[in-house]
């Protein structure tokens, strides 16, 4: 039986791998069980870790710290990499509003924590720990402990408060999302949102009556116009054609245009007249040319095209084809000449069969090559993220510098590389399954270590009178701000439920609740909203944990 002892009990690298794998496997297995329609998924790994720690299972502290940190880093970086392409565009679609709402969650929770500390007699260091647990924010806990050390005070007291409040901190956000869904969200809300996400482009028909564009090429007209558009068909003298950018537009031409719905009015002013909403008019057969054409979706797989402008390829002029749409990470984009291509983009190409074959050679369309992992961007991003997280930021009035830490730095760099990497010709593409695998692996490691560390003293603290008080306070600090702000965001501000859920999860730094939201809400809105508010929320949480101790102790 000595080999069993060395495998499960005696501290070693092998024992650490076995214990963490066992906790993760049990937690993930139990996480698939549905109770009242709810399953905790990967979150159950945390509770499996607590149980293992309670029964005396442990691993080497340095191994524990390494695995916990590395798991968190992998998770947040992969998340940033996934949502990066849609992150900055989200600021034009309500991202500022989402961040303001997230700040409201942070401020409301902090205010309640200070009030509870003075009214219940719980010491401020313990209350800061409870607040960190209620918001599932271990970087803030680390910042608070570092501040206490620098002030010459006991630094271990907040950790137990965090561990006691953490489980209901995880569940509290899930309950808030579930409560808002049950009370306010209709099935049609989710269906409409799913439909809207799949149709971001708009097809309209116009007739040319504006003298300012008579006898001008499509390229010249595009340079004159702010709204972006693609002319996919041109009807002239009873014939339909696919125009190139050099095609001259004449009075009376009828155009089938792909644009965004909000730009349709501006294009009506540009061209002169918008046709009936139903662009399939009886007097025009826009599909007449289709007997000679085929439509095919081609994937960009040639690395040298990564970061190039679509217009620089001059595909329409060289091959007489039309690119109507581009799909990227599940988002439908307008195929404008200024669009920067990324590896993995899927282009809808319309043209003759021979021309499409030539375009296929230009773009690559070798889907198998995309399955090869691009790990350089992952490791470079992690290094840069950790470097950013270690940079001290001096805040006026605070003696201790503030740092973004292991979570804040990598997610910001992940977002930046996911967004701007292709423009620097850095290959950042990963398949959705590979990204999900990285995130799930990182989160499982992080939660297993967190639970194992908290489990040793968890039940002893919980069943003491002050432990029950801490649990109640932590649950209140989780539930009250999220429900109030979530209700306001969905009911008053009319923000879609997916974005509200992601905002609440991000403002509470709760990746486990995000995992639940992603499993139950269609589309990527929860992940995009989470990444939109997470960096600022994390930064504020870390600052506030230090500010409270410095100014109120």
UniProtKB/Swiss-Prot annotation:
One cellular component (GO) term of this entry: plasma membrane
Matches recorded under PROSITE patterns: RCK_C
GO biological process: potassium ion transport
Membrane topology field: Multi-pass membrane protein
First-listed, main subcellular location of the protein, grouped into a coarse class: membrane
GO molecular function (one): monoatomic cation transmembrane transporter activity
Record keywords: Cell membrane, Membrane, Repeat, Transmembrane, Transmembrane helix, Transport
Signal peptide (UniProt feature, chain positions): none
SUPFAM superfamilies (alphabetical): TrkA C-terminal domain-like
Stretches that traverse the bilayer: 13-30, 37-59, 69-91, 98-120, 157-179, 375-397, 402-424, 436-458, 468-490, 497-514, 529-551
Domain of life: Bacteria
Pfam families found in the cross-reference section: Asp-Al_Ex, TrkA_C
Compartmental location: Cell membrane
Protein name as it appears in the record: Uncharacterized transporter BF1818
Organism: Bacteroides fragilis (strain YCH46)
